[in-house]
Amino acid sequence: MTTRYLLDKSAAYRAHLPAVRHRLEPLMERGLLARCGITDLEFGVSARSREDHRTLGTYRRDALEYVNTPDTVWVRAWEIQEALTDKGFHRSVKIPDLIIAAVAEHHGIPVMHYDQDFERIAAITRQPVEWVVAPGTA
């Protein structure tokens, strides 16, 4: 079985770096990278103009499979956040990352990331997450 990943912006934004590009390009070529609603919004923030926003949207729609965000994801994100309070991490983990992790967990796919938040979440959920490259190298 081939693993498909939910691509977080923390990994995608580093695609200009050779090691990250080397990791992501084969996955993209094989259609193994996915997006969800919240990742689309995160990418939209980086647009410098309306035209750039449209270009980013078209690129993401063409390049990445879309996985939906069912209503149960919001409940699960709340549960994860609540569990993070026990470790004192509920304020340090970004809300979009909670949602992305819950979407990935719902669909049974790992998050491809470059963000410690997903490691903190996975310590609670035991879901698979993967650094796009080793931490500290990008």
Swiss-Prot record:
Keywords: Hydrolase, Magnesium, Metal-binding, Nuclease, Toxin-antitoxin system. Its EC number is 3.1.-.-. The keyword Metal-binding applies. Its cofactor is Mg(2+). Residues 6-128 form the PINc domain. The keyword Ribonucleoprotein does not apply. CDD domains: PIN_MtVapC3_VapC21-like. It is an enzyme of class 3 (hydrolase). Mg(2+) binds at D8, D97. Pfam families: PIN. One of its GO terms (molecular function) is RNA endonuclease activity. Transmembrane segments: none annotated. Toxic component of a type II toxin-antitoxin (TA) system. An RNase. Upon expression in M.smegmatis inhibits colony formation. Its toxic effect is neutralized by coexpression with cognate antitoxin VapB21. Belongs to the PINc/VapC protein family. This is Ribonuclease VapC21.
